[in-house]
Amino acid sequence: MDLQRFNFLIMTTQGRVATMSFMSLDHAQKVDLAKTGLFFHNNLIKCIGCRATMDRVDARRVKRHTYSDTCVSAINALVANESLRKRSFASFKWARRQFGSRAREVDMLSRRGFYCVGKRLRCAGCKVVTTCVSVDGAQRAHAADCAFRRVFDVDLDACALANVVRVDLPPPRLEPRPSAPFDAAVSECKVCFVNEKSVCFLPCRHLVVCAECSPRCKRCCVCNGKIASRLSTIPQ
């Protein structure tokens, strides 16, 4: 493969996964690596968004790259992928200790753009770094123009949800639709434009001519296919 085609290939996640076809990893691992910009070339794992290179898949270096604040590809993946941000809270010892029994807060923080890196929280949108472990504190740390600043949660408790389910909503109003007017041009013979089409050509199965014009046709008027036989139908 020439260099130009290879450069186009690694521009997409699927293309970067394709470069890892010879690596002894399962498909899910390859996709995770490719989403953060990594691809395989000349026996090295490289990144399209930064200068990171690895001669093998090193879990610690991969984790550091995945949650990097300098790699363009990794940052884009974190901005777009809430589950990737959420996964960071299980990837660092400090986060596991702080949020091990606070799954709801992890959901709320990752929804607001935050992910864990080391012993801090960082926003994928505005790049702000905070040591706050509360949702309110982290939310206040956002930059004023951060896209994640105005995220909020809709909380329906079990009682409210049950009330919504029990509501007897009226059926939707169905407006009668006027029937479409008959279009004579649709059913007329495509040869004489007078009679109604009633002969189906086989094997192409195109219904385009009337019984009078059918014998004159050696090939189908639509697909130009050779007519093997004809099937007469009842005009509509």
Curated annotation (Swiss-Prot):
Gene3D superfamilies: Zinc/RING finger domain, C3HC4 (zinc finger) (3.30.40.10). It comes from Orgyia pseudotsugata multicapsid polyhedrosis virus. GO terms for molecular function: zinc ion binding. The keyword Zinc-finger applies. InterPro entries: BIR_rpt (IPR001370), Znf_RING/FYVE/PHD (IPR013083). Pfam families: zf-C3HC4_3 (PF13920). The lineage of its organism: Viruses, Viruses incertae sedis, Naldaviricetes, Lefavirales, Baculoviridae. Zn(2+) binds at C123, C126, H142, C146. This is Probable apoptosis inhibitor 2. Keywords: Apoptosis, Metal-binding, Zinc, Zinc-finger. Signal peptide: none annotated. It comes from the Viruses. PROSITE patterns: BIR_REPEAT_2. A zinc finger (RING-type) spans 189-223. BIR repeats lie at residues 85-150. The keyword Zinc-finger applies.
